[in-house]
Amino acid sequence: MSNFRDSSSPRRGYSEFDPESGEGLGRKKSLIRPERSRMDESHPRFHYTQVANQESNHIKVQPSSTGVDPRKSNELSTSRSHLSNYATPPHQEEEEDEGIPLMDIHNASPNVSSDQNNDLKGGREVYGLNDEINDYGSSPKKNQVISSSRPMNNEKPAKPKHDIYFWKVYCYAITFWAPAPLLKLFGLPTKDRQFAWREKIGLISCILYVGAFVAYLTFGFTKTVCSSQVVRTQINHVNGGYLIINGRAYDLTSSQHPKAAGIQAGSNVLYPPMNAGGKDASFLFQNVNGNCKGLIKPRDNCSIPYDGDELAWYMPCRLFNQDGSTKPNNTFAYYKGWACHTSETARDAYYKLKVNGDVYFTWDDVKNSSRNLVVYSGNVLDLDLINWIETDDVTYPELFDKLRDDETYRGLDISLVLTNSEERQAARCLTEIIKVGSIDTDTIGCIASKVVLYMSLVFILSVVVVKFIMACWFKWVTSRKQGATMYDSKAWAKRNREIEDWVDHDHGIGAEVKTVPVKARANYKAAKTNRQSVFHRAQKLSLGPNADLSQYYDNPNALSKTFKYTTMSTQAALLGRNGYGKRGNNANKSVSGGFNGRQSNLYLTDQGSSTDLLNRPVSSYNPFDSMGDDSIVINGLSPDIIHPDVVPQPPVEYQPFGYPLAHTINLVTCYSEDEEGIRITLDSIATTDYPNSHKLILVICDGIIKGSGNDETTPDIVLDMMSDLTVPRDEVEAYSYVAVAQGSKRHNMAKVYAGFYKYNDETVPPEKQQRIPMITIVKCGTPEEASAPKPGNRGKRDSQIILMSFLQKVVFDERMTSLEYEMLQSIWRITGLMAEFYEIVLMVDADTKVFPDSLTHMVAEMVKDPTIMGLCGETKISNKAQTWVTAIQVFEYYISHHQAKAFESIFGGVTCLPGCFCMYRIKAPKGSDGYWVPILANPDIVERYSDNVVDTLHRKNLLLLGEDRYLSSLMLRTFPTRKQVFVPKAACKTVVPDKFKVLLSQRRRWINSTVHNLFELVLVKDLCGTFCFSMQFVIFIELIGTLVLPAAITFTIYVIIVAIVSKPTPVMSLVLLAVIFGLPGCLIVITVSSLSYLVYFVIYLFALPIWNFVLPSYAYWKFDDFSWGETRTVAGGDKGDHSAVEGKFDSSKIAMKRWREWERERRSTENRKQQQQQQLTNNSSNNLAVPGAAWDPSNTGGNLIDDLSQGSSSGSS
């Protein structure tokens, strides 16, 4: 396909965020040619390429900047999706360089024939997928169901076993002692449960391995590599119980000396009369005739016994003080050679003495000016002892005197000074006769242990300090610039105090809900004037209130310069000058005035057809509006089904917060919540200050569930909060869809209720009630499970997939289930918008209250930076001081946001966007040519998140317990170069568990899902940074830290106890602990707006054994528990998981058609009904014409938006 870039195309503001949207040449981001990459199911762009290839006959796909086109591939796979029925083509590497033109703002490709242009077969323009052609031979049959080259009853082709073979063998090997019968006896009847238990034991063993390694590294490594069993004693500190001989200390306290001259038999030489204790006796056991042989020679008149060059001794055999203060004395006490121990018996007795320690000198000792000491090869030599040599009897080399007399050598290491062989032999000789000890040095092992210790210390401190610094930077600099408004320091601190006041007391200036103009209120009805006139199309619609915008179309670049950022609405405005709506013979046809095909159809009107694209005071813009005969081609949904009281759409240039508004779906998933919890959530979303024209509430009830303590089922509670339903409540039908489950539960049914949110005047005053469109989807289950305890229940992930799969079908114009078509039609009924208009999804749990301006700041961040694919706000605790269980959670919540998420947000890689309050981008603008990149609606996200094959412990923990965190991880894996950030300006509050058993159950799910998601993320190689300075390495450290939490807190307590009861005090360990636990406390003092958090910090410290030992240990032992436990309880329900397989999936019950086929079928049915009715009424001629728009702007009096001043004078009904 051709590239739609044009040299004259305007460059809008969002391009600055996307450096790849320029015209520069060169390969981007990767040294590997993506077109040569391996294309299999493990590739992050695999499913996207499948869909792009399958739907390439009616959508345009922009190749990446590397030239890769997913539609042109030689490698195709036979694998198929479990939610769709497309074939498997290849994919391309860089998703940022590819896109789908949800709006082509330039001319059609020159390579596309004119016929294709007329039918829009070759491309996809504006917001729709216009693949309808006159020849229906290639269209799917009306009753076509899911088809495939293989039976759909098979859940999914089995994966090769070789990748998990080793793990299975290991699990069976380590649990060999627990045979299957024994496990069955202990309540594990099925093979799946038994193998899950074996996997649990295998994972626990791995955790023990990691903990043992950390323990060894902390306590055992030094002892292993630096295991010096000999005690080392510093010189001048050798006490009287030891005798020093040749630099070694001997314990002679229990020795007995044989009878000798002056010595009685059995006496101890350490005591009187010898008094040798603590002295140096090296001259009493001289090393002679070794290295000194040939150097120290006898004189001719030598009185020392000798044999050739061998001498009996060199110095007089006397004791001298260890401090070297003894002067030379060449006399003998009793006779010549007395005490020299030259006999074989004396020598053997000496050699058998046990060495109790080495005597060592520090460098300060060596440099002692009172002694003449030098170091040679680690040995300390006392050169003054040369003076003891009996020079009258022997001769020695002149080098001895030179070394002794040269002051420059004193206190130095002379190992490198003595270089030639003669000098080295002389040095070895001196080592044998005048060595007094060893220099204070460590062995290689000891040095290595210290290096490891200090490197670990530096690394841990670096991580902690860098996180602290980054968190402070984020708080003081980055966060103030986020969102719709930039605050200075004082205003930012004031806002934080307002949020805290709102959390604690549910009031505050910033939390006040604004008054709503009368005509925008929930109780205002169009029927108050003339409801039927809304549908009357007797007169042509004109430019009306937006006439001032016509100036932009005289200057092609004027409008594009108006919009700094890109949204679907701004691109709709740009259509006016690019001739959208040229179809067949109507392309150059003037309906209300003459204009050619290049002119906008801004003024184009038609009976039951398009109106002014910008002049839409009612939000009834249908990008598929018919411009031909509907009996031949279905180009759009019928405008006659639009609700008369839809919320008006403001002009496209309306920017109340300084950025173009983006349409947002507010998804609220419900399970067993009570009325109060659901009402609080829906009230807070409905009353946010974000314009109600751009927000839609979508509530999905996960089954017919009655929460514990509730009088009604959850669906009934929600439906009681709706009014003005498009279809009466008791007439709504159930529609089929493919659920995220296995076996017969893959077929599920749901009902779609469309209307508007119904406030309670006691919770929200009438003057503050915005009119909000609302859709409720109730998963009611198939008729076969009507009597089951929880009919329709498939889990929260299935609820999310209902929306995500629907958005994918809309973006790619794929075949839809009947439920998805009903969703498309319901959105059209209550908003007048096609679903493609929506760009953002806010996900909120049904027990969360949102701060009034949170949605505004979150959408602002999305619109201003198209590279952001997901973000989250701050979750506050509303019941802080309810019990000790809630109190210990306050600081944990705070630090997880303002340290962990703040640090990750600096690098755009927040690893967990909490499902209770987060926002995802459905699609992102790409370049200036109208292309959009599917994000949340990306097939790779939808297919992998909807995976129903959960046959391993790892996948069950990912998909059944931690689906919210898994979605965040999946987004980072699929789009590693895009951002997930934290926006503290957006705040919400929720009620946390107040009972320990509930907290235990909740954290069991969170911890286990965290471990498995971190393991997934640590394998992502494309995250920012390199080696140790990368998010991947930080995630690896976080994974190890999570696994060893129980061991770490045990080591911490041990170190503290050792520091108290023993010596020496482990100073470094205590400093490390102080930094690790102290910096978070400093973070509170520096950044928090309420000092009460310091109290909760102290409480958190006392609760550390619970957080770091009790909770993770319990979670690890419950690795094979996939239930939600005590977190969500239902009346009469169980706590089972959604992984059970029951029955077989019958695909024939689920029809899959494109939305046009569904619409054609609906219109045909209605036409038949009308014909039958006309026959019954004798063809009455007073029927109303089919309406084409939901609102006549001539009724507004020229005003699109009511002024607040009207609120005082206008009434409401």
Curated annotation (Swiss-Prot):
Reaction catalysed by this enzyme: [(1->4)-N-acetyl-beta-D-glucosaminyl](n) + UDP-N-acetyl-alpha-D-glucosamine = [(1->4)-N-acetyl-beta-D-glucosaminyl](n+1) + UDP + H(+)
Gene Ontology MF annotations: chitin synthase activity
Sugar attachment sites: N588, N1008
Alphabetic keyword roster: Cell membrane, Cell wall biogenesis/degradation, Glycoprotein, Glycosyltransferase, Membrane, Transferase, Transmembrane, Transmembrane helix
Membrane-crossing residue ranges in chain numbering: 169-189, 201-221, 451-471, 1017-1037, 1040-1060, 1066-1086
Enzyme Commission numbers on file: 2.4.1.16
Annotated protein name in UniProt: Chitin synthase 3
Family: Belongs to the chitin synthase family. Class IV subfamily.
Composition bias type Polar residues, residue spans: 75-87
Extracellular side: 190-200, 472-1016, 1061-1065
One cellular component term from this protein's GO annotations in UniProt: plasma membrane
